[in-house]
C-alpha cells in the first residue's frame, strides 16, 4: 500500500509483470541509455542489471573435450559429469531450460524438447540441490561442466578458480533484475530519484567493473571475466510467454526427467 517501502529493488521481471496493479508507472530519463532489448517498454519495470545463463567449465578436468554450447553437452564423455539444479525448484535452472528451448528451436518445438530429453539423459540423474551447488561443484572438481549463471561464475574467474565461462553459441539469454515503484509510495519523488540513480552512468559502471553484475546501460564498463555483449550470440526471452506458461514448461520437464529415472 506504499505506507512503508517505496521501491521493490530486485526480483524477477516476470513476477512484476504479472502484478501490474501493485506498481506506479514510471520511466526514467536514463532509460534512453539502456540496451534496446532491456528498456522499460511496459512503463513500470526498470531493468537495472542482467544475468545470463552460461556454462561453467572446469579447466583442469575438461582436457580436449570441446564445449562451446548446448549441443556439446550431449557428448557421451560428459555423461554423469554435468552439474545442473532442478528447473522445477531453481530459478537459474529454469532459466537454462527456457534458454535451451529457445536456442534449440522454440518453447513448443518438438526437436527442442528432444534436446532437453537427451541432455538430461546425459546428466544421468545427478541433480544438485541448489544453484550454488552447480558452480561450486564445478569449481571444486566434482563436475566437468555446469549449467549456471554469469554473476557467481564471473566471481570465481576473478578469484582465480580453475574455471572458465562459456556463452552458448546457439544463443544466450540475459534476464533483467528489476525494480519498480510501489503504487501509492509515500515519498514518490525520492522513489523516482532512486530509479534514476540505479540507471545512472556512475552506478552502472560500478556494477560492471567493481562487481560481477552486468549493466543494462549501453557501453557501461565490465570486468575482465565478462565477455562483451557484442561478442555473445544474445537471444531474447519471450518473458510474457514464459510467465504465462511456466507451470506447463515445468510439468513437461518433470515428465521427461521422471521417465528417464524410471528406465
Provide a role label for each language-model segment:
Residues 1-142:
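Extracytoplasmic ligand-binding site segments that recognize negatively charged/polar headgroups
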Residues 12-18, 139, 144-162:
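A ligand-binding cleft/hinge motif common to bilobed small-molecule-binding domains
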Residues 25-28, 163-167, 216:
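Short hydrophobic/aromatic-enriched beta-strand-loop microsegments
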Residues 71, 135-136, 154, 192, ...:
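Alpha-helical segments flanking ligand/cofactor-binding loops in enzyme cores
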Residues 172-173, 177-237:
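Mature extracytoplasmic/periplasmic domains
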